[in-house]
Design a protein with these regions (language model features):
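Conserved interdomain hinge at the start of the Helicase C-terminal
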Residues: 566, 625-660
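Conserved RecA-like P-loop NTPase helicase motor core
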Residues: 613, 625-635, 686-754
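Signature of the SF2 helicase/ATPase Hel1-core->accessory helical subdomain module
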Residues: 173, 179, 199, 204-207, ...
């Protein structure tokens, strides 16, 4: 074999130099192939001795080449060489052995030859798009974007492409990525920020592509497991009515009975989105699928499990649609187990498209943020033991477990366990009281002398040390720590005793209590991490609401660029980042730096801007009321009501009315609903219908007015005259005094930057 058929002259020379500088010993190289499959660049990963070298596969990306030299000149691979090559070959990697002079080569696993694509045959007057859809308008900008992505696939490069509104970017990225994946038997992930865009892709764009490409391929929308009903949790709930039930309990049991009927007679998927009515999060959390509450194959409902049935369908799919949050949840698992793993949420993938890519930084930062709150603490403690409802299955996991133990143990065994249970409950009550006391004092501390209904404040322990209320918080926290230690001892003793009886636990009552105990330990760690506030690189802050008194405590990382670079961008190359808003001053430097792409120097990143085909000056107008009250004024929304009513009437509805909070949405909806006749207008309020139904109602109604929050700010496709205006009550920009924004600005200035 000729070395030049596999490695470029420059790369060969670089390897000779590195081998020479290593004293002729073994060197482990990463080989980076060009678009033709020739290794054009090499990077030293490890150096060894005359007979071996460390093979650090975790440093390699997909579709690269591991190269090492045999100083003896005998290029026959060892058993270890073959084993490592086999492992890397499973993810599309190649493996070569060379001699020290790099003029002889042994190819253990050849580099996979990728079939290149050309989208030209699909565009133009005689293209497949025009043939299938004569009225389908191919825009020049759309074709231009598709060609950029075609090149990034063929050349194995990352691409950042800003595509203005109206480009038709979903078709522009779906066509080349799907063509490339189908031709080369690869898997594509499309990650979006909004459910609206996911539904547009699945219900409109992808079926359209199927007709254009004329190739059969599978695609799935991958939802988080929390969207699926858990049969074990559902059927473990006692729904028999008791005379002592409160009205709230009766209502909840009725909803659970409806869910049981829905599961038995209606749904095939168990997807919450299929429900024809809204259900509160607090009730859904009692019946939804959760990773730590899942018994897997040991569950009696495993064969009929909605979540696992959904997961079986994604294994064979060429295209998977996910949201950004799920993508980063999956990435966190890969960070712990290795990028190419069998333990991740998503199957291993080859191509990633980030649509609505401007949200990546915030989504990743939110995912790596620690959070606790008074409400979540109370809910978790209530799931373990609800002291307000002690005589039913709603009394918490320990009550359900004791009911099961009473049926499964002898009276002597049960009596022993019951004593230990009483010790646990006594300490649970102490722990709960101390925790709530801390949260209540924090609410007072952060809302003192502040009349706003929502307060965001940075927690500066140095400044707060002189505050009496804060000192009281820290004193109670010492007691909270002590109670936690006692609680752990008592629960461990209780669980050890129960575990010694080797019960079958088919329904999972012991399993459920153990899982809630693990959650409690994780919750306490997060709480102490935030309250102690010692870790560098985080901003510690609080969000207080005074209407329904609650305080949320956060620890948010300043910078997530290293996390993304190390765990994602260095692992693969065929990635597309697209949105209508990525560039600043026609450059992508700010965006690349914010998410870690600026650190990516091994491969060139293509950067393109595709202008919008819209003539904004002729096709739209912007109206701003100059006499509106300041948005911080409590009368702000009431003051806007007349202006908004006039604006809606000017277009006879056909408008989106968008808000940054549910309270503002509900207030304005109640103000306006009596002013618009039901015969003339159709008012559609978020939470009255599932999101996808809201869009369908809007598209097919007379003079529609949609009241929505962040779900409708982007990723919504309503064509033609049905949507004439968008009314934005407040721009959803971060204010400079937002604790996280403020901390990021401080950190930038600290580094001598603007």
């Amino acid at each position: 074999m000729k070395v030049a058929e596999f490695i470029s002259a420059k790369a060969m020379e670089d390897m000779r130099l590195e081998i020479s500088e290593s004293g002729g010993n073994e060197v482990f190289f990463r080989g980076i192939p060009d678009g033709e499959g020739i290794v054009s660049e090499v990077e030293v990963i490890a150096r060894g001795n005359s007979s071996s070298v460390a093979a650090l596969l975790n440093m390699m990306r997909k579709n690269e080449v591991i190269i090492h030299n045999h100083p003896s000149g005998v290029l026959i691979p060892s058993d270890e060489d073959v084993s490592i090559s086999s492992m890397y070959g499973e993810v599309g990697g190649a493996s070569y052995i060379v001699n020290n002079a790099v003029d002889d080569i042994y190819v253990i696993v050849p580099l996979k030859e990728f079939i290149k694509i050309d989208v030209d045959e699909y565009f133009g007057e005689n293209g497949a798009i025009h043939k299938n859809f004569g009225k389908f308008e191919v825009r020049r900008e759309q074709y231009e974007m598709a060609k950029f992505i075609e090149n990034s696939m063929n050349e194995n490069k990352k691409l950042i492409v800003e595509a203005g509104t109206g480009t038709g970017k979903t078709i522009a990225y779906l066509l080349p990525t799907l063509l490339y994946a189908i031709e080369n038997n690869l898997k594509v992930i499309v990650s979006t920020n909004t459910i609206n865009l996911q539904e547009q892709l699945v219900n409109k764009d992808i079926p359209l592509l199927k007709k254009i490409i004329d190739e059969d391929f599978n695609y799935q929308i991958v939802k988080g497991r929390g969207n699926y009903l858990c049969k074990r949790k559902l059927y473990n709930i006692d729904v028999t009515e008791k005379e002592t039930d409160t009205e709230e309990e009766k209502t909840e049991k009725n909803i659970i009975r409806n869910l049981i009927d829905w599961d038995k007679n209606v749904t095939r998927t168990g997807d919450r989105n299929e429900l024809k009515y809204e259900i509160s999060n607090s009730i859904w959390e009692k019946v939804n699928s959760e990773a730590d509450m899942c018994k897997g194959v040991k569950c009696p409902y495993y064969s009929k499990c909605h979540f696992f049935n959904a997961r079986k369908n994604i294994a064979d799919a060429t295209l998977l649609i996910v949201n950004h949050h799920m993508f980063f949840a999956d990435l966190a698992i890969r960070n712990q187990t290795g990028f190419y793993t069998n333990y991740s949420i998503l199957p291993n993938y080859d191509i990633v498209v980030f649509d609505e890519a401007h949200n990546i930084e915030d989504t990743a930062r939110n995912y790596f943020t620690f959070e606790t709150s008074k409400i979540s603490f109370g809910r978790l403690m209530g799931n373990i033991y609800n002291r307000r409802v002690v005589n039913s299955s709603n009394g918490g996991a320990i009550v359900r477990l004791m009911t099961y133990l009473n049926e499964s143990l002898s009276s002597e065994e049960y009596e022993k366990v019951d004593e230990l249970k009483e010790d646990v409950i006594a300490e649970l009550n102490v722990f709960y009281d101390k925790g709530i006391d801390i949260f209540d004092k924090l609410i007072y501390l952060f809302s003192e002398n502040n009349d706003n209904r929502e307060i965001k404040i940075k927690i500066d322990k140095q400044k707060m040390r002189s505050n009496k209320a804060f000192r009281e918080v820290m004193e109670i926290n010492s007691q909270f720590k002590e109670s936690y230690g006692n609680l752990v001892i008592r629960i461990n003793k209780f669980l050890n005793t129960v575990s010694n009886y080797n019960l079958e636990d088919k329904e999972g009552f012991l399993f459920e209590f153990s899982r809630y105990y693990e959650r409690l330990k994780q919750y306490y760690k997060k709480f102490e991490f935030i309250l102690e506030g010692k870790e560098e690189g985080y901003v510690y802050w609080a969000n207080v609401t005074t209407v329904r008194p609650n305080v949320k405590l956060y620890a948010t990382p300043f910078d997530i660029s290293d996390e993304l670079n190390d765990n994602l961008f260095t692992k693969m190359d065929r990635m597309v980042f697209t949105s209508a808003t990525l560039a600043v001053d026609n450059k992508f430097d700010y965006y690349k730096k914010s998410i870690g792409l600026m650190k990516e120097n091994r491969r060139k990143i293509d950067e393109r801007i595709v202008k919008s085909p819209f003539d904004y000056e002729k096709q739209m107008k912007v109206y701003i009321p100059e006499d509106a009250l300041d948005p911080t004024n409590i009368e702000f929304m009431r003051d806007l009501t007349g202006f908004i009513e006039e604006a809606i009437r000017s277009t006879k509805g056909h408008c989106f009315l968008l808000f940054t909070s549910y309270s503002a949405l509900n207030f304005l909806y109640n103000q306006l609903k009596s002013r618009f006749s039901e015969k003339e207008y159709t008012l559609i309020k978020q939470n009255d219908f599932p999101r996808h139904e809201m869009i369908e109602i809007f598209k097919n109604s007379k003079n529609p007015i949609l009241f929505g929050t962040d779900s409708f700010w982007e990723g919504v496709d309503v064509q033609g005259e049905q949507l004439k205006s968008v009314i934005i009550t407040k721009l959803p920009f971060k204010v400079p005094n937002d604790p996280v924004t403020e901390a990021i600005i401080e950190n930038i200035r600290k580094n001598g930057q603007n």
